[in-house]
Amino acid sequence: MSKFIDRVVLHVRAGKGGHGCASVHREKFKPLGGPDGGNGGNGGDVVLEVDPNVHTLLDFHFHPHAKAGNGKPGEGGNRDGKMGSDLLLKVPDGTVVLDRDGEVLVDLVGAGNRFVAARGGRGGLGNAALASKARKAPGFALLGEDGEERDLVLELKSVADVGLVGFPSAGKSSLVSVLSAAKPKIADYPFTTLVPNLGVVASGDTTFTIADVPGLIPGASQGRGLGLDFLRHLERCAVLAHVVDCATLEPGRDPISDVDALEAELAAYKPALAADAGLGDLADRPRVVILNKTDVPDAAELAEMVTPEFTARGWPVFQISAVSRAGLRPLTFALADLVREYREAHPKAAPKRPVIRPIAVDESGFTVHPDPDEPGGFIVRGARPERWVRQTQFDNDEAVGYLADRLARLGVEEELVRLGAEPGAPVTIGDVTFDWEPQISAGVDMVRTGRGTDVRLEQSDRVSAAERKHASRVRRGLVEDDEQR
């Protein structure tokens, strides 16, 4: 039997984007073929998908690192790099994804639901994509971006309609085994059940699931016993059923005190998904009291004594015996009625046809602030300038000049001048710090330098038709050579 794991920490890393290619087309009789470097492929995503055939997070317990494929670099001949392969991870129904700070990112309920845990990096553009009228043959390309990388916490919260709560050895597992076809481990010692057991119960035309949660003890909401680890499996339950051991001989225990102690723990526990599930706190869920083991001598008499107390609280009470199966039929009908009422009050939303709409993303904004750690320095923050820096190959002068042009067009340079930045001031963008040299005053010279232009366009050794005609006339003596005049 596989080990049940309901909480893991998963480190996900998406694939890196491939670098763009800086290449010039080479073909016979075409000395100026132009740039033909392809773009790099995007990195693969790490995706979580609900699979109804998966029931535990065991795979992630033994393999806590997940990495998607990297994108391939672009090649000459306008060949784009291959995209990195996505990594699809199967998770059980009811998996909750949280970040390291405990914030819920997504609640995966329903077969086929997906969540992109880490997005792959964008591939860099090749020099063919960077070519323009002013930059006919760029001698550089853009680098691919790194993919997202982060730690996620996966918690499994059972998807059941009815949750059985009670002290250890109250008979919860036995009840699940007789109400459904489930075969949980049953033994006569505390904490026999260490993992939640799910069973499917059919009553008339209603079918519902029932969950046997490991035994709770006072202090469970603070982590005593196994309660803190398994109370979360009750968060999705629409009905809570107290299973009370009427045959216990433990000193200081009786059905009323047992239920009161468990109610205190349920009231102290605050479900993280209460608002999302629409069920409210555990203390507000419908209750059913199941007085078990009434086939034991004196247990039936005790059950009769405590029944009025629970009835006065407005809770239905059922006296049963999981061993002899006495009283199970009315209990099953009552649970089915409560589940049916909940489903009628909370109908499932009809599946909507997915409509894909582009999301407008404004990356034009940026901020410039003085650097508190560097006198006279500045820090530039913004999605676009930081991405440009990550894509720049700083050992290529053309690439650095292209970055400077882009920052100037975005308005970063004007903002630095407005804030009083001096030439040579250290400016930090992302993880890169450089000495700033203003280019606004040299804007005309910047255009004349032909940055990113193939030098062969300016230095051509080809002889024109007029020059060939003049040379022929010189050889025949029809005209004098210009150099001999």
Swiss-Prot record:
Domain Obg: 2-159
Gene3D superfamilies linked: GTP-binding protein OBG, C-terminal domain, GTP1/OBG domain, P-loop containing nucleotide triphosphate hydrolases
Pfam families according to UniProt: DUF1967, GTP1_OBG, MMR_HSR1
Residue ranges of domain OBG-type G in the record: 160-340
Keywords in alphabetical order: Cytoplasm, GTP-binding, Hydrolase, Magnesium, Metal-binding, Nucleotide-binding
Span of domain OCT: 358-438
Chain positions recorded as GTP binding sites: 166-173, 191-195, 212-215, 292-295, 321-323
Entry cofactors: Mg(2+)
Entry GO CC: cytoplasm
Stretches for region Disordered: 64-84, 457-485
UniProt-annotated location(s): Cytoplasm
EC number: 3.6.5.-
Keyword Acetylation: no
Family membership noted in the UniProt record: Belongs to the TRAFAC class OBG-HflX-like GTPase superfamily. OBG GTPase family.
Protein task: An essential GTPase which binds GTP, GDP and possibly (p)ppGpp with moderate affinity, with high nucleotide exchange rates and a fairly low GTP hydrolysis rate. Plays a role in control of the cell cycle, stress response, ribosome biogenesis and in those bacteria that undergo differentiation, in morphogenesis control.
Subunit structure: Monomer.
UniProt-recorded name of the protein: GTPase Obg
Native species: Nocardia farcinica (strain IFM 10152)
Gene (UniProt): obg
